[in-house]
Swiss-Prot record:
SUPFAM superfamilies: BPTI-like (SSF57362). This is Kunitz-type serine protease inhibitor PILP-2. Residues 1-24 form the signal peptide. Belongs to the venom Kunitz-type family. It is found in: Secreted. Disulfide bonds join 31-81, 40-64, 56-77. The record marks 41-42 as: Reactive bond for chymotrypsin. CDD domains: Kunitz_textilinin-like. One of its GO terms (molecular function) is serine-type endopeptidase inhibitor activity.
Amino acid sequence: MSSGGLLLLLGLLTLWMELTPVSSKNRPPFCNLLPEPGRCNAIVRAFYYNSRPRKCLEFPYGGCGGNANNFKTIEECQRTCAG
């Protein structure tokens, strides 16, 4: 197969992976929790998984408490809940 064909195949595979939804059976249950800012008053940038658009979104975290649907980075959220 030519390098152009391999590049096209790689592109199509990447597109397929992006468009294929993650099965909710493989997603931890806490990914379905609503974002919980916690009981403290700090304003920390955090991310949570939103099951409606099936993606990780930013929310203001208070710095303590909250629930498990709370991630420091969007990459961590995506690895855990979005696939």
